[in-house]
């Protein structure tokens, strides 16, 4: 398959697994691909789930809702029931998307929401045990950030445990599934280091991106690394992402800009010219 020119982000949740009453059938899940047939879309950027937890048959990560018996919202419970039900019957959701897309000549780039914060146990039912059990790995762990700082409960990438946990989920996906590339959504909540440690953090993040890129290319030479970032190069630099260094070293194959946000905010009028 040739390098795609039109790539479509499929959330996998709101337009798919949230919409069907359990038990979801394989044919229903395949609608994630079928609804794009007849369109010029060449590659599907398919979201792996919440990011802290996922909606496929992972062995190194955590399945969405595996740690829950009570749910504050029907939709979140439905996602767990549908994903776990498909997996129990031998239908891995991510593999189904890959196989269906390839059947019709479309590429698949799984999308990992790399970063987001953590809420309370009672309400944040999509969160992983890893997050709940390791608050010391969060950016605000020292307790010295202003009240309301948006990245205080996000993971601090200065910690090797954080980088390893994120990387292992990516590596498993590259190893286990017939994907054509991988997307890091780094603009979902773009906070990766304590504000006082951004300068040191840039090199840490560049080293980690290099590790991901190498793993991807070793798993398949033609596989591409796509990275979604805030559209401001300066804004990225200020939160620890040295985009110019990544590009100079050839660590990124596809660069996707969005409005600086947390979580996502789409603005079709934003100036993307700095990325060109």
What are the functions of these language-model segments?
Residues 2-27, 67-99, 103-104, 110-172, ...:
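Active-site-adjacent "subsite" loops/lids of carbohydrate-active enzymes
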Residues 27-59, 172-182, 251-257:
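Catalytic domains of carbohydrate-active enzymes, especially glycoside hydrolases
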Residues 33-34, 94-98, 243, 269-273:
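Short amphipathic alpha-helical segments and helix-helix/interface helices
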Residues 41-87, 191-195, 257, 266-272:
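Aromatic-lined carbohydrate-binding/catalytic grooves of carbohydrate-active enzymes
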Residues 12-16, 50-53, 114-118, 188-191, ...:
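Solvent-exposed loop/turn segments at secondary-structure junctions
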Residues 3-9, 43-45, 105-111, 152, ...:
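Structural preference for beta-strand elements that scaffold enzyme active sites
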Residues 19-20, 55-60, 113, 119-125, ...:
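Short, solvent-exposed loop/turn and secondary-structure capping segments
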Residues 161-276:
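Active-site neighborhood of glycoside hydrolase catalytic domains
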């Amino acid at each position: 398959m040739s390098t795609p020119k039109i790539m479509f982000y499929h959330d996998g949740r709101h337009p798919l697994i949230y919409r069907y009453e359990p038990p979801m059938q394989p044919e229903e899940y395949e609608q994630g691909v079928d609804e794009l047939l007849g369109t010029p879309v060449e590659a599907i950027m398919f979201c792996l789930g919440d990011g802290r937890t996922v909606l496929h048959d992972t062995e190194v990560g955590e399945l969405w809702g595996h740690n829950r018996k009570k749910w504050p919202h029907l939709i979140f419970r439905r996602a767990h029931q549908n994903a776990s039900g498909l997996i129990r019957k031998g239908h891995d959701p991510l593999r189904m998307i890959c196989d269906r897309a390839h059947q019709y000549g479309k590429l698949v780039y799984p999308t990992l929401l790399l970063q987001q914060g953590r809420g309370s146990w009672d309400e944040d039912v999509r969160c992983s045990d890893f997050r709940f059990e390791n608050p010391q790995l969060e950016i605000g762990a020292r307790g010295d950030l202003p009240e309301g700082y948006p990245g205080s409960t996000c993971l601090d990438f200065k910690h090797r445990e954080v980088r390893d946990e994120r990387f292992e989920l990516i590596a498993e996906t590259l190893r286990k599934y017939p994907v054509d590339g991988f997307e890091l959504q780094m603009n979902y909540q773009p906070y990766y280091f304590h504000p006082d440690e951004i300068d040191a953090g840039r090199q840490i993040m560049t080293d980690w991106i290099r590790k991901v890129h190498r793993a991807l290319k070793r798993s398949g030479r033609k596989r591409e690394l796509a990275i979604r970032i805030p559209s401001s190069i300066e804004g990225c630099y200020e939160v620890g992402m040295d985009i110019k260094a990544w590009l100079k070293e050839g660590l990124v194959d596809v660069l996707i800009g969005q409005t600086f946000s947390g979580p996502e905010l789409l603005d079709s009028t934003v100036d993307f010219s700095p990325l060109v």
